[in-house]
């Protein structure tokens, strides 16, 4: 497994374990790097199995992030840490927080999907057509999803005008991590998509740390109803709906999330788990 550490050996800094989206690699978000330094945060992350330098793990679930995250933290000598993720990474971050309650101090989820079996949520309503088709293929199994992905093409309609502006401007970094992820073939994305329609293996209702859910109200990739459901499921969640934002442009609010997370991380640094 390939891991990242923005401040190797600096055990005095509160750590944030970043969970990347689909298809991405785990490089911590470049647009937030300077702010993380200013806030005194230590970014750590890893490539999920099948991406970048990490070998595949067929059958992994969102909850597998707890196993992987714990390995990274242990290897780096990190005891407690916050988690943060965007898109599918938000689902992995919340599942990690649910399963590692003794270690996770806070969680931030931006534009994340809810579990497929989320009670009372119509999972596909508001989702762009080709994205919904891909997840329906995943529900029919790995072979069907592989056939679908082999024939699929990029659909610019998945993103709003605000998303496209972000991708061409302050969040052009996404192009780099997507290219790095796709260079290794489709395996990581296929395993991710199968995980999103399978049980997470960790219930958001079991998260005990403070949670911040952020979601653009114009999101076509993961409709904002998913964020609302997650906020209602996590016992201590705060929901911030972002007017006019889509799936990518929602990350323009990430600096505020980082400040929120840094404040909690400082208060809990060195505290005994419990």
What is the role of each PLM region?
Residues 2-53:
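Conserved HGGG/HGGXW glycine-rich cap/lid loop of the alpha/beta-hydrolase fold
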Residues 64-81:
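Conserved acidic catalytic loop of the alpha/beta-hydrolase fold
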Residues 85-89, 93:
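Gly/Ala-rich beta-loop-alpha elbow adjacent to hydrolase catalytic centers
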Residues 106-140:
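Flexible "cap/lid" loop of the alpha/beta hydrolase fold
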Residues 127-202:
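Alpha/beta-hydrolase
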Residues 207, 213-215, 219:
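Short beta-strand/loop motif that positions the catalytic acidic residue
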Residues 220-226:
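Conserved alpha/beta-hydrolase "acid-adjacent" motif
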Residues 237-274:
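Catalytic active-site module of serine/aspartate enzymes centered on a nucleophile-bearing elbow/loop
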């Amino acid at each position: 497994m390939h891991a990242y550490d923005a401040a190797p050996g600096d055990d005095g800094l509160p750590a944030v374990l970043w969970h990347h989206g689909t298809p991405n690699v785990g490089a911590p978000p470049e647009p937030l790097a300077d702010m993380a330094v200013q806030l005194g945060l230590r970014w750590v992350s890893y490539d999920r199995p099948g991406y970048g330098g990490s070998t595949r793990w067929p059958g992994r679930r969102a909850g597998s992030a707890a196993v992987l995250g714990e390995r990274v933290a242990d290897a780096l000598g990190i005891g407690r840490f916050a988690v943060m993720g965007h898109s599918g990474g938000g689902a992995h971050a919340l599942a990690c927080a649910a399963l590692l309650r003794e270690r996770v101090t806070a969680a931030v989820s931006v534009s994340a999907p809810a579990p497929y079996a989320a009670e009372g949520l119509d999972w596909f309503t508001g989702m762009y057509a080709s994205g919904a088709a891909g997840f329906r293929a995943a529900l029919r199994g790995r072979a069907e999803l592989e056939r679908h992905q082999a024939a699929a093409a990029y659909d610019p309609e998945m993103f709003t005008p605000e998303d496209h502006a972000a991708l061409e401007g302050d969040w052009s970094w996404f192009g780099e991590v997507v290219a790095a992820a796709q260079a290794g073939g489709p395996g990581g994305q296929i395993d991710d998509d199968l995980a999103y329609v399978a049980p997470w293996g960790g219930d958001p209702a079991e998260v005990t740390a403070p949670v911040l859910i952020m979601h653009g109200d114009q999101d076509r990739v993961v409709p904002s109803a998913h964020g609302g459901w997650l906020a209602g499921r996590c016992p201590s969640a705060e929901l911030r709906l972002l007017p006019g934002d889509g799936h990518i442009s929602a990350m323009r609010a990430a600096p505020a999330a980082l400040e929120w997370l840094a404040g909690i991380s400082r208060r809990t640094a060195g505290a005994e788990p419990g």
